[in-house]
């Protein structure tokens, strides 16, 4: 078996060509650099990052270019203090050995830094105090003179006259005054109007009041009638009936209101009596109750027509429309009416 494996191995290897010999290749030449390779810094050598300094000279940490703190006389471990102490005892007047620096002279006429000079009677401060008092007096004189000059200049200046307004400005002012005091002008005009006999004037006012009351009631009835006919033509008979019920409530309300105003002629007692006997504020409540009971009882049992709440309320507020028309008529009559001429007596009183 070993012989067979050797024969198979030798037969499978390719033959070596005769033109190539084993010694025909030349060796590769390696050229090394002349410089030495740099090593990584370990922080131990002088000058390296984290290493010791390159020189052994002491560094000047404090004061920049000043003396070295190790050799200065301020440290307690200085060994050369004996010579300095001997010089201090031998010649105490030497200024070079004085540790305290010389102070500059304080500015001003009085030095508060030296407290002992104030307690001493030998120090004469009369000149400084006299000069300060003179300066204060001089400043006061200057201020008084300047104030006097200002007052004289104000007195000499000519008085300022108000300019007359232009026509447009006067019209604007008149309109603003009329808008602000329009009601007061009318009131004063009525007060200045000459009055006749009080009884005759009261009778005229009473007659005018009754005319106005009857006019408002007739106007309410007329507007309500027009609304009732319009509701009957445009809508259903049920809506017309509801509007008519509200119109009746409106007429009742106006009647009660007129009676309350009539009671004011008797004074406070009449006002209280009229307010108690004429509960006109309950009229809309009564209308709502009639609407509820009518639809709940009369409609299902007796077959009456159904009522609507909104037409009833519209018919009730018919008196508001009549009052509004009456107010517009009064405003138009006041604006179109020319103001009556004022008598000479009232003009003289003005």
UniProtKB/Swiss-Prot annotation:
Residues 7-26 have a biased composition (Polar residues). InterPro entries: CGL160/ATPI_dom (IPR056309). Signal peptide: none annotated. One of its GO terms (cellular component) is chloroplast thylakoid membrane. Keywords: Chloroplast, Membrane, Phosphoprotein, Plastid, Thylakoid, Transit peptide, Transmembrane, Transmembrane helix. The chain crosses the membrane at residues 213-233, 239-259, 276-296, 304-324. One of its GO terms (biological process) is chloroplast proton-transporting ATP synthase complex assembly. It is a multi-pass membrane protein. Residues 7-58 are annotated as: Disordered. Residues 1-46 form a transit peptide. Disruption phenotype: Reduced growth rate. Increase in xanthophyll cycle activity and energy-dependent non-photochemical quenching. Facilitates the assembly of the membrane proton channel of the chloroplastic F-type ATPase. Specifically required for the efficient assembly and integration of the CF(0) subunit c into the chloroplastic ATPase complex in the thylakoid membrane. This is Protein CONSERVED ONLY IN THE GREEN LINEAGE 160, chloroplastic. It comes from Arabidopsis thaliana (Mouse-ear cress). The lineage of its organism: Eukaryota, Viridiplantae, Streptophyta, Embryophyta, Tracheophyta. The gene is CGL160.
